[in-house]
From Swiss-Prot:
GO terms for molecular function: kinesin binding. The modification Phosphoserine is found at residues 162, 460, 521, 524. Keywords: Calcium, Cell adhesion, Cell projection, Coiled coil, Cytoplasm, Cytoplasmic vesicle, Cytoskeleton, Microtubule, Motor protein, Phosphoprotein, Repeat, TPR repeat. The modification Phosphotyrosine is found at residue 449. It comes from the Eukaryota. Oligomeric complex composed of two heavy chains and two light chains. Interacts with SPAG9. Interacts with ATCAY; may link mitochondria to KLC1 and regulate mitochondria localization into neuron projections. Interacts (via TPR repeats) with TOR1A; the interaction associates TOR1A with the kinesin oligomeric complex. Interacts with BORCS5. Interacts with MAPK8IP3/JIP3 and NTRK2/TRKB; interaction with NTRK2/TRKB is mediated by MAPK8IP3/JIP3. Interacts with CLSTN1; phosphorylation at Ser-460 inhibits interaction with CLSTN1. This is Kinesin light chain 1. The keyword Lyase does not apply. The lineage of its organism: Eukaryota, Metazoa, Chordata, Craniata, Vertebrata. It comes from Pongo abelii. Residues 155-176 have a biased composition (Basic and acidic residues). Its main location: other. It is found in: Cell projection, Growth cone; Cytoplasmic vesicle; Cytoplasm, Cytoskeleton. Phosphorylation at Ser-460 by ERK inhibits interaction with CLSTN1 and localization to cytoplasmic vesicles.
Length: 560
């Protein structure tokens, strides 16, 4: 039997040379099952033989049974040995899989290190180029010095002639108003930011952020999105130290680097440290670019946002007002970026209960948006919604209701044409259902008038919020049927919007998996509820989106 088993094992080993690892594991599992079955069978036979041996007397027949029992025991030992070896093979397979997984992780780390190495190589190449240019400049200056000394010896008699000449060794560079573009901004915002940057460049000198700082910014964002602040912070500090050594502390590039580091601290909720860095960047930009530069306005705005996150609205307000003055001076009083700043200032005033100022700022921003961007621009609806929320805070329900109806009517007209008896916006249907609730229980089917919002893409969040707010206002007035109609529409609109966003994100991931590295961390601070979102210059853009349920509770979103 042992010879036969050895032969079988030899045959199996000969076959293993041609099997894949998965096939080996599968065969091993089958062998384990077979050996377990044989072991159970041998145990049963052994028990039977032992019971037979007890019944027999000591004679030749009992000796034969005892010999069989010994053979069964040897077979059981061999079966247990085979099972042990099979289990060792399975454990080895699991270990190899773990090793392979670890190897994949190490490969990912190697790729990351290669990226960092490439960045360092680029930095080294850039430094070498600068060194070469500096050496050439030194050699040229030495030649010029020798020439001037020779000419001076020839013209010693002429004391009135001076060989010195004035040279401008360095021109002040101007950082962009918007440090790095925000990929999550909507197209309208992107166009406005480009226009703002172009205007600032035309007036102030067309400053370009160095490519190495953009590369560093992307690396820092990637690390911060993964929560690896222990890598991102030292990387920023080292780059800042290098810039200060090469360019000095009072240089626009240093201010840019301070903004990047402030962004990292902001993501860690270290608002005090971030504010200190922005104050330093503000001082540098005021000194190197002038106090009325667009970059100074951007830094003032970002600093105001950080104060807002800490609830220091009184300290934030003068900073925001100064940023507004600069933008009005540089861009003109009717520029869309001025309207953004007005929205931010209105938000800060609203948190302090200065409702008259809030109304003024929102009305002025609304006028700019309607004049410059047109009545169908998303910012128009958003600003109307913000102004309506201000009215609600003061109990001016009629004015708020009028604005909400204007938003819904405009959205309806944009999708379905002018309003008439056969083409009504949803708030009209809601009020008709309220009037007819006693006469007709079921009312009009939602499907007859509820599909208008499906085509609203840009305005869908604002429209949904408006539906909720107007519904809450109806409920406060006792118009429960109308309120339920609008709330049902808001729920369907929100569900459809979430489905569309989900599909879009899935499509983006399928087309470009690396897009998932984008990180835009967003924090919220409850005042009534204030939500700040990331904006240009590594800082904040602030606007407002307000939801009201009749209990004076608000959700405030972005401050630029």
């Amino acid at each position: 039997m042992y010879d036969n088993m050895s032969t079988m094992v030899y045959i199996k080993e000969d076959k293993l040379e041609k099997l894949t690892q998965d096939e080996i594991i599968s065969k091993t599992k089958q062998v384990i099952q077979g050996l377990e079955a044989l072991k159970n069978e041998h145990n049963s036979i052994l028990q039977s033989l032992l019971e037979t041996l007890k019944c027999l007397k000591k004679d030749d027949e009992s000796n034969l049974v005892e010999e069989k029992s010994n053979m069964i025991r040897k077979s059981l030992e061999m079966l247990e040995l085979g099972l042990s070896e099979a289990q060792v093979m399975m454990a080895l397979s699991n270990h190899l899989n773990a090793v392979e997984s670890e190897k994949q992780k190490l490969r990912a780390q190697v790729r990351r290190l290669c990226q960092e190495n490439q960045w360092l190589r680029d930095e080294l190449a850039n430094t070498q180029q600068k060194l070469q240019k500096s050496e050439q400049s030194v050699a040229q200056l030495e030649e010029e010095k020798k020439h001037l000394e020779f000419m001076n010896q020839l013209k010693k008699y002429d004391d009135d002639i001076s060989p010195s000449e004035d040279k401008d060794t360095d021109s002040t560079k101007e950082p962009l108003d918007d440090l790095f573009p925000n990929d999550e901004d909507d197209p309208g915002q992107g166009i406005q930011q480009q226009h703002s940057s172009a205007a600032a460049a035309a007036q102030q000198g067309d400053y370009e952020i160095p490519a190495r700082l953009r590369t560093l910014h992307n690396l820092v964002i990637q690390y911060a999105s993964q929560g690896r602040y222990e890598v991102a912070v030292p990387l920023c500090k080292q780059a800042l130290e290098d810039l200060e050594k090469t360019s000095g502390h009072d240089h626009p590039d240093v201010a840019t680097m301070l903004n990047i580091l402030a962004l990292v601290y902001r993501d860690q909720n270290k608002y005090k440290d971030a504010a200190n860095l922005l104050n330093d960047a503000l001082a540098i930009r005021e000194k190197t670019l002038g106090k009325d530069h667009p970059a100074v306005a951007a830094t003032l705005n970002n600093l105001a946002v950080l104060y807002g996150k800490r609830g220091k609205y009184k300290e934030a307000e003068p900073l925001c007002k100064r940023a507004l003055e600069i933008r009005e001076k540089v861009l003109g009083k009717d520029h869309p970026d001025v309207a953004k700043q007005l929205n931010n200032l209105a938000l800060l005033c609203q948190n302090q209960g200065k409702y008259e100022e809030v109304e003024y700022y929102y009305q002025r921003a609304l006028e700019i948006y309607q004049t410059k961007l047109g009545p169908d621009d998303p910012n128009v609806a958003k600003t109307k919604n913000n102004l309506a929320s201000c009215y609600l805070k003061q109990g001016k329900f009629k004015q708020a209701e009028t604005l909400y109806k204007e938003i819904l009517t405009r959205a309806h007209e944009r999708e379905f044409g002018s309003v008439d008896d056969e083409n009504k916006p949803i708030w009209m249907h809601a009020e008709e259902r309220e009037e007819c609730k006693g006469k007709q229980k079921d009312g009009t089917s939602f499907g007859e008038y509820g599909g208008w919002y499906k085509a609203c893409k840009v305005d869908s969040p604002t429209v949904t919020t408006t539906l909720k707010n107007l519904g809450a206002l109806y409920r406060r007035q006792g118009k429960f049927e109308a309120a339920e109609t609008l709330e049902e529409a808001a729920m369907r609109s929100r569900k459809q919007g979430l489905d569309n966003v989900h599909k879009q994100r899935v499509a983006e991931v399928l087309n470009d998996p690396e897009n998932m590295e984008k990180r835009r961390s967003r924090e919220s601070l409850n005042v009534d509820v204030v939500k700040y979102e990331s904006g240009p210059d590594g800082g904040e853009e602030v606007s407002m989106s307000v939801e009201w349920n009749g209990m004076r509770k608000m959700k405030l979103g972005l401050v630029k």
